[in-house]
Regions:
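Conserved FAD-binding catalytic core of PHBH/FMO-like flavoproteins
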Residues: 110, 153, 157-258
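Extreme N-terminal starter segment of soluble prokaryotic enzymes
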Residues: 1-4
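A conserved short coil-to-beta-strand element within the FAD-binding core of flavoproteins
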Residues: 122-136
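C-terminal helical "tail/cap" subdomain of flavin- and related membrane-associated enzymes
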Residues: 223, 302-378
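Core beta-strand elements of the Rossmann-like FAD/NAD(P) dinucleotide-binding domain
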Residues: 144-153
Length: 378
């Protein structure tokens, strides 16, 4: 019987598994996918998340491979409304790290394999979960064979459509959303290599973030979900709103509709939720993966204590539930504000929005805003 089985081998699940392993726990990761994804997906690693990477000895390796985003600029109608620096808000790491998710996952998997060789299992599907009071049983299928695994605790890190959450009977409560976007990565062109740019334009927000290898991530709000859009369609939106002409690209485009949900509870007996299984947050603002990592930073020591001193389990896991649900609610409010600011605006609303941006971009408000955008409060 394992100490902990983590269901879901994405960036949140594998980071948590590493944090448990460095504490000496017997941990195993079950991942449904047979092969890792090669999509860039989440790219931003905020300063508080660097603490988790430091615990695993990965902070330097991540920073070496990444682009450091040291600040951002907000523009409208070809003019800068305000600039923001992360220098004062971010402490030891005065920047947001930009690295494609597949590279981050590869580093995490390699480190976990060093800590717990052979304990990352891919191509495994969970079909049932049963909390027996003193342990959890998982029914799984692997290569057509059904088996039962046991652990003292099971952690659901299996994403927004979490099978474990559903099997445990935990509801997800919707908290707004519905805005739609297109996203893709393009050759960088002439924009500053360490600066994010937000275009608060009349037709909706366009966002641009640097990536390693001379590329940039571009995101644009759309009036409806456009699942068949191409990179040329996104480039046309960017040019029409901002005047920026993107280089031709054959990269795939992601069309997504924002969903925000919070699980009614994060702990059910010996089953614990983390990441998108616990809270689904708008990706606008780059909070989702980081929020899950901060879950892991709190949950790893809590589970270690609960296993070694069982009498503390109810208290430490209740504290985890309370604190991380509170952080998720704060993140959802901030994500809602980010989306509201990026919606189409004309006339008085446009002038009021631009005025608010100018106000927030100067001290003392700028320091507060920088802390919020670098997730110092979560």
């Amino acid at each position: 019987m394992r100490d902990v089985i983590v269901v879901g081998g994405g960036p949140v699940g594998i980071l948590l598994a590493g944090l448990l392993a460095v504490r000496g726990l017997d941990v195993e990761v079950l991942e449904r996918r047979a092969e890792p994804s090669r999509r860039s997906r989440a790219i931003g690693i905020h300063p508080p998340s660097m603490r988790a990477l430091e615990e695993l000895g990965l902070a330097d390796a991540v920073v070496e491979r990444a682009v450091r985003i040291r600040g951002g600029e907000v523009r409208c109608d070809g003019r800068a409304l305000g600039r923001l620096t992360f220098r004062e808000a971010a402490g030891q790491h005065p920047f947001v790290v930009s690295l494609p998710q597949y590279e981050t996952e590869a580093l995490l998997r390699a480190r976990f394999d060093e800590l717990s060789p052979g304990r990352y299992r891919s191509g495994v599907t969970v079909t049932d979960v049963r909390d027996r009071g003193d342990r959890v049983e998982l029914e799984v299928e692997e290569a057509g064979t059904a088996t039962v695994l046991e652990a003292r605790y099971v952690v659901a890190a299996d994403g927004a459509r979490s099978v474990i959450r559903a099997l445990a009977g935990i509801r997800g409560i919707k908290r707004g959303g519905g805005d739609t976007y297109l996203m893709s990565d393009y050759p960088a062109g002439e924009q500053a290599a360490e600066q994010a740019v937000l275009y608060f334009e009349r037709g909706g927000v366009v966002e641009s973030f640097p990536l390693p290898g001379g590329r940039r991530r571009w995101v644009a709000m759309t009036s409806s979900l456009q699942p068949d859009a191409s990179s040329h369609d996104l480039a046309a939106i960017v040019e029409s709103r901002t005047g920026v002409v993107l280089p031709s690209s054959g990269a795939s485009v992601s069309a997504f509709s924002v969903q925000q949900r919070l699980a009614e509870r994060l702990v059910s007996g010996r089953i614990v939720l983390v990441g998108d299984a616990a809270h689904q947050i708008s990706p606008i603002g780059g909070q989702g993966m980081n929020l899950g990592w901060l879950d892991g930073l709190l949950l790893a020591p809590a589970l270690a204590l609960a296993i070694r001193e069982p009498g503390t389990a109810a208290s430490v896991l209740s504290d985890y539930d309370r604190r991380r649900r509170r952080s998720a609610r704060m993140a959802a409010r901030q994500a809602g504000f980010n989306m509201m600011m990026g919606r189409p605006a004309t006339g008085l609303r446009l002038r009021l929005r631009n005025g608010l941006v100018r106000t927030l971009a100067v001290p003392p408000a700028s320091a507060v805003l920088a802390s919020a955008f670098t997730m110092r409060w979560l």
